[in-house]
Swiss-Prot record:
The protein's name in its UniProt record: Semaphorin-3D
Keywords, comma-separated and alphabetical: Developmental protein, Differentiation, Disulfide bond, Glycoprotein, Immunoglobulin domain, Neurogenesis, Secreted, Signal
Gene: SEMA3D
Domain Sema positions: 44-531
Main location: secreted
Length: 777
């Protein structure tokens, strides 16, 4: 395909006499609507930052001028509050309104540490400060907090108790402790932690350079302090790991079987080759692991890991892999042992850029951990399936009195179990997605997915999982997964939302089901975003059904939030098919009160004119029809050398008298067609225009009108000749041109008034006809 494109470019440079035709071809290819399945990958609704502010569905945190880099969030649904970790600051915010009565703690790094950090060559603004990376609930009244401390991690406790009906929000500066192996040194390093039973489980780097990575357990009740970490001497365990998520997931109803699962990516080297690849992994350890008795002392004795596969199967048998895990989200189910695992992955290739979402089941993950182990003779060998004897109890099994009364803790494990786990921590089989491949993917776009949260929504026609996907350019994609026949899935992109004023990578997202809000952090700000904006879809039943948004339904008067209820109500919604014809039985009334926009446009013969028509839905296919003057029949307009269809409307070059008439812009989604714009075009004959021009030449009105018309015609030619020049840029240019024109009008008038004040010093004054053209008009 690239070779063909190069040939076309070469031909265009050689055959310059074909330039106008090639311009027309490139314009047509650039702007013609995309049809078929590709349309479904286009967000149906695209809202800018300004649109979100106007709809009151986006609230930016305004107290952020004192601290940036908002990558740590702790959601407290029960008390309706949000803790925000930033640069040198910790904020306590309300889930209802981020800017209402918020509190803050200023916690900078020690001055001597900042100076040492600078001497080490680190950046004073982006590295040599105290970036808050750990916010974990320690108990009902305290939060455990850690910061990078200018590459010297430090931890402490925040008091969140109540005193005289007022919330205490205070850092205990008298009980600060080292944050090594609890918090990363580098504020940009991927990191994961979870607190359970007053134990902190962390995946991070243990040194200044970030080379030694470890998964650790620290803290705990004062009477039972067990510090455990991965074995640094065994490179099979972890190799440059980047930790993404850590979770407590019970395996059975027996609490002795409780495990901590952690997700990460790491480097891997196969055989004697020097090439290293990035692989995504899931690992697990037992909560009751206290290390070995004679070997692996204060090291995990139940550590296992397996590969996570997220790939697109190729027709030739070669898969396309998304190997770099970026984020993990666990969607709760009724069974706390079996949450649905959602993962965001990206490609490692600099040529083939893409992102994907893969979904896994805990049953499949457990099956891999209960399967065969991988074996490697030495660093120069490849991983193979281990076929030897497996010691008892099975390595990776949690000690339990019900399993074996003689093994009460990991210190009771036989030596052969400890020796086996040191060399065989990798499982031979990999974990594959439940769908066999990605549930959602984005390929060759100008952004990558970075974050994900998922909401399970009950709609009128079923239950749906709605994904909110953050990107590295500060946008959020709202995607619904729809089950089709034969176990096929359809992914519909409902919205693309620009939640930040300027492009900024999304670092963290938290979902509040009670508030129906998303809380999104980036390096430049924090935003509170509503899960739904039903009123933006339109004012008709058809618009609401076409949206296919599980959150929204037609209530008879408007598109509003759908709430499941036992009462019988006339709520119309069709998420599965998006067919308003079956849902909106009073469809004619629904469309009639919508009323398409009607405008009258005048064009000058032999000049060009543009008929604007921008559908609200980007998934709609536009067709143009004309009803010529004196004719009752409508005919569809086909593009040719004079008529060019663009994504913004219809460009008609060299207007003719026969072009006069009523133009209908119709949008089609699925089987539903409706008119969104009616335009009456009146073509003024060139001879008539010249007569008018001569009659009004003294005032110069028509002259300016023609100049503006010719200028715009030249601009359209510029759009045709430059594929990189969009209509958005044209409109921006026209806006600035109008501003300059108004300033030019106002400036000379003011200057003229000043001259009138000084008329006693002048003998003659200019007449209006002698003034510059900008004033005369």
């Amino acid at each position: 395909m690239n070779a063909n494109k190069d040939e076309r470019l070469k031909a265009r440079s050689q055959d310059f006499h074909l330039f106008p035709a090639l311009m027309m071809l490139s314009m047509t290819m650039l702007f013609l609507p995309v049809t078929g399945t590709l349309k479904q990958n286009i967000p149906r609704l695209k809202l800018t930052y300004k649109d979100l502010l106007l709809s009151n569905s986006c609230i930016p945190f305004l107290g952020s001028s004192e601290g940036l880099d908002f990558q740590t969030l702790l959601l407290d649904e029960e008390r309706g509050r949000l803790l925000l970790g930033a640069k040198d600051h910790i904020f306590l915010l309300s889930l209802v309104d981020l800017n209402k009565n918020f509190k803050k703690i200023y916690w900078p790094a020690a001055k001597e540490r900042v100076e040492l950090c600078k001497l080490a060559g680190k950046d004073a603004n982006t590295e040599c400060a105290n970036f808050i990376r750990v916010l974990q609930p320690y108990n009902k009244t305290h939060i455990y907090v850690c910061g990078t401390g200018a590459f010297h991690p430090i931890c402490g406790y925040i008091d969140l108790g109540v005193y005289k009906e007022d919330i205490i929000f205070k850092l205990d500066t008298h009980n600060l402790e080292s944050g090594r192996l609890k918090c990363p040194f580098d504020p940009q390093q991927p990191f994961a932690s979870v607190m359970t039973d007053e134990y902190l489980y962390s995946g991070t780097a243990s040194d200044f350079l970030g080379k030694d990575t470890a998964f650790t357990r620290s803290l705990g009740p004062t009477h039972d302090h067990h510090y455990i970490r991965t074995d640094i001497s065994e490179h099979y365990w972890l190799n440059g790991a980047k930790f993404i998520g850590t979770f407590f997931i019970p395996d059975t109803y027996n609490p002795d079987d409780d495990k901590i699962y952690f997700f990460f990516r790491e480097s891997s080297q196969e055989g004697s080759t020097s090439d290293k690849t990035i692989l995504s992994r899931v690992g697990r350890v037992c909560k009751n692991d206290v290390g070995g008795q004679r070997s692996l002392i204060n090291k995990w004795t139940t550590f296992l890991k397996a590969r996570l596969i997220c790939s697109i199967p190729g027709s030739d048998g070669a898969d396309t892999y998304f190997d770099e895990l970026q984020d993990i989200y666990l969607l709760p189910t009724r069974d706390e042992r079996n949450p649905v695992v959602y993962g965001v992955f990206t490609t490692t290739s600099s040529i083939f850029k893409g992102s994907a979402v893969c979904v896994y089941s805990m049953a499949d993950i457990r099956a891999v951990f209960n399967g065969p182990y991988a074996h490697k003779e030495s660093a120069d060998h490849r991983w193979v399936q281990y076929d030897g004897r497996i010691p008892y109890p099975r390595p990776g099994t949690c000690p339990s009195k019900t399993y074996d009364p003689l093994i009460k803790s990991t210190r009771d494990f036989p030596d052969d179990v400890i020796s086996f786990i040191k060399r065989h921590s990798v499982m031979y089989k990999s974990v594959y997605p439940v769908a066999g491949g990605p549930t959602f993917k984005r390929i060759n776009v100008d952004y990558r997915l970075t974050q994900i949260v998922v909401d399970h929504v009950i709609a009128e026609d079923g239950q749906y999982d709605v994904m909110f996907l953050g990107t590295d350019i500060g946008t959020v994609l709202k995607v619904v997964s729809i089950s089709k026949e034969k176990w096929n899935m359809e992914e519909v992109v409902l919205e693309e939302l620009q939640i930040f004023k300027h492009s900024s990578i999304i670092l963290n997202m938290e979902l509040s089901l009670k508030q129906q809000q998303l809380y999104i952090g980036s390096r430049d700000g924090l935003v509170q975003l509503s899960l739904h904006r039903c009123d933006t879809y339109g004012k008709a039943c058809a618009d609401c059904c076409l949206a296919r948004d599980p959150y929204c339904a037609w209530d008879g008067n408007a598109c509003s939030r759908y709430a499941p209820t036992s009462k019988r109500r006339a709520r119309r919604q069709d998420v599965k098919y998006g067919d308003p014809i079956t849902q909106c039985w009073d469809i004619e009334d629904s469309i009639s009160h919508e009323t398409a926009d009607e405008k009258v446009i005048f064009g000058i013969e032999f000049n060009s004119t543009f008929l604007e028509c921008i559908p609200k839905s980007q998934q709609a296919t536009i067709k143009w029809y004309i009803q010529r003057s004196g004719d009752e029949h409508r005919e569809e307009l086909k593009p040719d050398e004079r008529i060019i269809k663009t994504e913004y409307g219809l460009l008609i070059r060299s207007l003719q008298k026969k072009d006069s008439g009523m133009y209908y812009c119709k949008a089609q989604e699925h089987t539903f067609i409706h008119t969104i714009v009616k335009l009456t075009l009146n073509v003024i004959e060139n001879e008539q225009m010249e007569n008018t021009q001569r009659a009004e030449h003294e005032e110069g009105k028509v002259k300016d009108l023609l100049a503006e018309s010719r200028l715009r015609y030249k601009d359209y030619i510029q759009i045709l000749s430059s594929p990189n020049f969009s209509l958005d840029q044209y409109c921006e240019q026209m806006w600035h041109r109008e501003k300059r024109r108004q300033r030019n009008k106002g400036g000379p008038k003011w200057k003229h008034m000043q001259e009138m004040k000084k008329k006693r010093n002048r003998r003659h004054h200019r007449d209006l006809d002698e003034l510059p053209r900008a004033v005369a008009t």
